[in-house]
Amino acid sequence: MGKYSKRLVLPALAMMLLSANANAENISVSTPNTSLVVDATKGGAFKFVYYGDKLSAADIATLQAGGTAGKDAYPVYGLSGASEAALSVRHFDGNMTLQMDVEGYTEVQEKNAHVLRVKLKDRQYPFYVTVCYRAYNDVDIIEMWTEINNGEKQAVTLSQFDSAYLPIRRGNVWMSHLYGSWANEAQLSEEELKPGTFVVENRDGTRNSHTSHGEVMFSLDGKAQENTGRVIGAAICYSGNYKLRAVTDDSEYHQFFAGIDEYNSEYHLQKGETFTTPATAFSYSHDGLSGVSRNFHRWGREYKLMHGDRERKILLNSWEGVYFDINEAGMAQMMADIKSMGGELFVMDDGWFGDKYKRDTDNCALGDWVVDRKKLPHGIDGLLAEAKKQGVKFGIWLEPEMSNTTSELYEKHPDWVVKAPKRDLQLGRGGTQVVLDLANPKVQDFVFSIVDDMMTKYPEIDYIKWDANMNISNHGSQYLTANNQSHLYIEYHRGFEKVLQRIRAKYPDLTIQACASGGGRANWGVLPYFDEFWVSDNTDALQRVYMQWGTSYFFPAITMASHISNAPNHQTFRTIPLKYRIDVAMSGRLGMEIQPKILNDEEKALCRKAIAEYKTIRPIVQFGDIYRLQSPYEKKGVASLMYVGEKKDKAVFYWWKTETFVNQHLPRIPMAGLDPQKRYRITELDRIDNEPLSFEGKSFSGEYLMQNGLEIPYKQNVDYHKQNDWASRVLLLEAE
């Protein structure tokens, strides 16, 4: 599929080569710089052969003359002893084994990708698995998923049903993954793969990226490096529970499996039914971790992310400014304030609704999406009129999947909530929150109607902040049959996706943020329907350096809502100077999470200047290529990254000091991604120093900057009474 490149990369062959049968029918699934080769010989076992740097036709021919057969391309349970499996089932007659052979394959050219579909059939049962690969024509991403079809007389039970499997040749292989918790999301962890099984999984039920992320990277040449070395990245594109397994047994290969977490999710596949797993996206690069990140960022912006080609507005969100203390005059003042600083959008957060139960705190009224006329006498219409007057767009907060026991919705429809039979409800936020059962089509209709009614009445609304503040903690569906209770986790997310599809079909231009108690929905399963996600409820700038660093492994800056917040910070109570808070926020989708009236004139002027400067670099940050330079996790006292424009004519360099000691020594940081032949003029943005930096306005070759970097002062050159233990820099590089 696709054209073969002419170069042969022997290290890559050594990386993942598995010899093929001499009579094999090898098929190459290729992207611009990578190849995945499988053996789909009709009547034989489906075999994996190779994944790595792109192969030429001659290399493919060499593989075909190989020798012994390779690893299974999709291992199944039953006849291979203790080996791990991607698929295990129980047939209608109780047989728990599978023996699959290739029945055939098809290749289809889509607009921007090639698709290979290899159909497998059990030797004794009319049970089918189609293993699918989509290779993109212009970005180094290959998606893999499976379609499982039951042609048997009765239902077949699926007990393990992974989307993808990839064997990785043993060696000095390291795995990078993200873990965390509420307000501490996307923390980076790196481990060498050793004998045993390493599992990354999430069982939250509604969200899936607080305690772990469904994405991993494998560094094949030892401990991960940012811009050198061979790396494989994998991301499951799913909004629900998942499990990623890296199994190291007594074979020569690490075995990587990715799929829906089977925990309490046994699935009864009816006669004639096809179960389609979520896709897992793979990328390979020999340009290190950042190389894989750039591949995922380009793929995401081009093919997955809603409005991935559209610049994001600079906004003010009301939450940390007023919390539940919503009132008409206060909202109008915040609109005026963000407009005066150059902002483009105002978002009214929680606290604006409720009739019988007033949303003055977090323990009531979810589901009762009517305006609290005491707080907002002129309703949403009045706020929209004020936004138009101020010249800003207007957005609003919703939590459509949730309710409270103290709500009119719950009083009317207690049968709509996720609830275990014969058990008392386990309640969430505020001691009253419950989750609506999206497995129920009536609930799907209701959740859709929340957005539909809002947008029908107020079509001028530009932005919705969609929140989700509870996990599934009452495992039980009042809609599903007793025999299908194990389907709840899966059916919830099928229902969720159906709702999102309906919303996007009717409101394709609406901007929607995925907020889920902060960063609970940072995944490629929801982003086809959402424009961005809230990285974390923790807006502390220092902690955001760490969280946004980890998040950037798989998600571009355009997806990361990054806001300037208060000092002391409302989560850590750390006092960080405004410049540092701005410089961190400018590395993502810039916004504000603050009450502007607490800012003095000097601070407002600094925000106004920073917003104006961000507008000039917005295309570079939101659409540029990331190069991570110095990790905060290495504890060198500094973190640094940069974004480079597609034509390498502009770049933005970020430098944040992460700790301060007297007479400390910080590393000088070489840049990356520049054109070595071009000369770049340096301009500092968000400058507060009394005098310009020594290199301000000067030009350096890209080669010099990538070999040497620049000597960054350890502190800001400001008056004595303004000095503190923080320092940060944002530099604009423009080719002459």
Where are these predicted regions, by residue range?
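Glycine-rich, aromatic-flanked loop segments that form ligand/cofactor-binding clefts
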Residues: G78-M100, E226-G240, S283-L305, G343-D350, ...
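Active-site neighborhood of glycoside hydrolase catalytic domains
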Residues: P377-G379, E411-H413, V417-K579, R589, ...
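Carbohydrate-binding surface patches
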Residues: N33, V216-F218, E226, P632-P676
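Conserved, mostly hydrophobic/aromatic
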Residues: N33, T146, G272, A387, ...
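Short Pro-Gly-centered flexible turn/kink motifs
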Residues: N33, L98-M100, Y267-H286, W726-E734
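Polysaccharide-binding surfaces and accessory modules of carbohydrate-active proteins
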Residues: E25-V38, A45-V247, Y263, R679-F695
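C-terminal beta-sandwich/jelly-roll accessory domains of carbohydrate-active enzymes
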Residues: E659-E736
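Aromatic-lined carbohydrate-binding/catalytic grooves of carbohydrate-active enzymes
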Residues: H307-S449, Y458, Y463
